[in-house]
Amino acid sequence: MRLDAVIFGGGATGLWLLDRLSRDGHHVVLLEARSLGAGQTIGSQAILRRSRSSTSSSGLANRVLIVPHGLPSLWRDALLGRITPNLTHTRLRADCCHQWYVESAGLRVASPDNPLRPRFDAETLPPEERPSALADVSGPVVRLPEQVLCPASFIADLAAQYHDRLLKIDAERGLKFHLNSPGEVDAIQLASPFDGQKLELRPRQVIFAADADNARLRRAVGLSEPMQSPRPLHRVLARGRLPLLNGNCVESGRTIVTVISDVDANERTVWQIDGRLAEDGWKRESYQQAERVRQELTRILPGLNLTQAEWSTYELDRAECDADTGPRHDAVSVFCAGNVTTAGPTPFMLAPLVSDEITGRASSPYITTPFDPTPLANWPRPSIAPLPWNEEHRTWWTLGDQPSKDQQQPQRRAA
């Protein structure tokens, strides 16, 4: 089957790119070895942030997420159906975020040189307008014009639009590259993970957008591994009778906690706790990490009742392109060799930028007839990865329990 492009990786970047190339008239399919969104996308905070800076727990100053001015508006327009991709079926967790500030001794929040000073685009809230979870916070509370998406809903939205172009593969036993030379792919031989049926794809361009799996894919086509490093995170989940909250706590210029909340399959409120504690927590066992987070939440959210909450944790090696101590995420990383393009690991909301970068380099479609998915009709399709708190075999506990072996060992998720 001749194609303009084959995409490896069904995360935010791969799906956005699939939409863009398809709309531009390319004959393109996307291959996924696990589930759509598995790894980084499904557990993403999915906050459509504006530019902000923080100091990381590893001591790297000014780690900055630099977001182009028009990118939040692009996402908003897509969610409203004003532009493509049409994301009108993507669910919002919240239409805004909140940020609250913990004052350090001797530091006045109102001081112009104070790193705790609220951002220019933030609306300071009077006590009566604060979310219930922030009612007793002593420092400033601000509202940020940053929407929060449900990544599972985003994936489902695009997957429904391009179902006939999504293929489930067996990357270990059912994938073989035929090369003309290193980095020059002539054909891709697939064997169905269900019944072993064969399929040969002959693309003009091969695109790796598989985050941590890019290294293995590049080796398979004779290329060196990209310059990227795993960033270990140990995230904590809490569920129960919790208030809805989406936002960040800032102390001494550092985002110490990020909370996103949702409702699970049984209508319980779930919090995912991220930030500095997740970066530091990879050294701790699950029960210790959950207890550490509980203590911190009690400190920064006075009045929050966590006595009946259930807890769980998971570890994730989030792939990031290697960088020095300067700004990070200020540009997308795209590497080209032969007819292989590799998209470096990218934060959720920057997926459109990777798409623009790759499509800007792509040749015009060379197949002029309409795309015919008939040869793919009987091929298995990838499912959508469950949200971390909806995983079937996830272990939960209360912090008053004696920790079991499961609670001592974090549940690990591939990046």
Predicted regions and their residues:
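Beta1/beta-strand and adjacent pyrophosphate-binding region of the FAD-binding site
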Residues: M1-T13
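Short hydrophobic core segments
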Residues: V6-F8, E200-D213
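Active-site substrate-recognition segment that forms the wall
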Residues: W16, F208-A337
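Glycine-rich FAD pyrophosphate-binding loop
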Residues: S22-G43
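Dinucleotide-binding Rossmann-like beta1-alpha1 core, especially the glycine-rich loop
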Residues: A46-P131
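Helix-loop-beta segment of a Rossmann-like dinucleotide-binding subdomain
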Residues: P126-D170, A187, E200-P203, R276-L277, ...
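C-terminal catalytic lobe of FAD-dependent flavoproteins
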Residues: P145, S153, R299-T395
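A conserved short coil-to-beta-strand element within the FAD-binding core of flavoproteins
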Residues: L167-F194
